[in-house]
Amino acid sequence: MKVTFYTLGCKVNQYETEAMREAFAAAGHTPVPNDAPFDAAVINSCTVTAESDRKTRQILHKVRRENPEAIIILTGCMVQAFSEEAKALTDADIVCGNTDVKKTVEYAERFLKDGERIFEVSEHKKTERFNTPVLSSFAERTRAYMKIEDGCDRYCTYCIIPTARGSVRSKPLAEIAAEAETLSRAGFSEIVLVGINLTSYGKGENFDICDAVEAAARPDGIKRVRLGSLEPDHMSDSVLKRLKAQKKFCPQFHLSLQSGCDETLKRMNRHYDTAFYRDLVSRIRTVFKDASVTTDVMVGFAGETEEEFSKSLAFVKEIGFAKTHVFAYSRRRGTVAYGLPGQITRAEKAERSRRMIETALSCEEEFLKNLVGKTECVLFETAENGFAEGYTANYSRVRVKSDESLGGKILPVKITASEKEYCIGQIK
């Protein structure tokens, strides 16, 4: 059976799709790209926003319309959070949650045998353990993601993810080390550790995120270890000190801000204020001279006044993020914020997004200007039209002239100029 995969959402979803791809291959099936003929399609959904749900439905209907005879498996966070709505999507032959991604192969083979529609969604349990399969590779990438944590117990008022993902659970250190060794042998030199609430890694255990970095960095072939999205209030001085001591650690800190206004942060049930965040960024930049701080910012949250938005805008400009992902608040049924007063219109959200993106791009441009004249080690990924592109340790995009394939190589590059969203350099 030829199987193709569609992935929406975060790096954890990308990892889990890769796990399903490997599981199908191990069972004797053939993974194929989306533009090749296929017998089955797996759609791994996201539900962080209403737009994510819309895109999932759109892909589902398109796949069914263009492939009426294919087996379609709908899984992921949308299914887990809104199972009855997912069940009603009759274009899917199999609807299954994300509690055990390994079972997608079993469901597909069962449907292939008897043709009966399958609906299997079980709730996450407090006693649930980390059970995501270990990967041996990561298709079509030069850096590998490694999922080391699942679940979230923080319950930000806007977020449905605790419902979709359950409580915090962590991958054992021995499994991290073993998977890193396997990825190293497969030719990967950089690993990105990812999770739903990554800084909660090790909660209730006798290890933490620093131990995870050290375990992933153990193989000689692994030259870089990067962290995914981080919660600011977990980043203590001791954590920064231990990360600094790990020579393979990449000094990019993606610290989820969400808002630069204290009143808004309080309504969001975030666990810090702007004073704490400002101090943390200062401490990071003191410990890591070449650090980049990147972030996510939400605009148009329930009750966000123009004054609150202006404070958030000013804070983003003050911090000077290397990169900012800007997105509009999406009202999600099942969250506290769904019932909050002061819901913002779509038009106002769009206008605030425009203003925030404008500020974010200005900060990014300024950050890249400061790299000019420096020599940075770049992990090259893509090549096109006589240019090769890759990323520095602090995740700045760099482009160089090159007619040869540099994919997967880490080379020193002298930064000679900067554009709005990338730098230009010469290989030394």
Q: Where would I find each of the regions flagged by the language model?
A:
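Conserved strand-turn element in the central/C-terminal portion of the radical SAM core barrel
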Residues: C159, T163-G166, V225-D233, S259-N269, ...
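Contiguous mid-protein beta-loop-alpha structural module that forms a pocket-lining wall or clamp
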Residues: E304, I319-F321
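Generic beta-strand/beta-sheet core signal
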Residues: Y6, T75, V194-I196, G228-L230, ...
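Terminal RNA-binding accessory module
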Residues: G339-K428
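Radical SAM/AdoMet-radical enzyme domain recognition
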Residues: R185, C210-R224, M235-T295
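Conserved, mostly hydrophobic/aromatic
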Residues: I176, L193, L227, L255, ...
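Conserved glycine-rich "GG(E/T)P / GGGxP" loop and the immediately following alpha-helix
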Residues: T47-S52, F188-P219, E231-S238, L265, ...
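Proteins enriched for Cys/Gly/acidic motifs involved in redox and nucleic-acid/cofactor modification
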Residues: M1-Y201, S238, L243, F249, ...
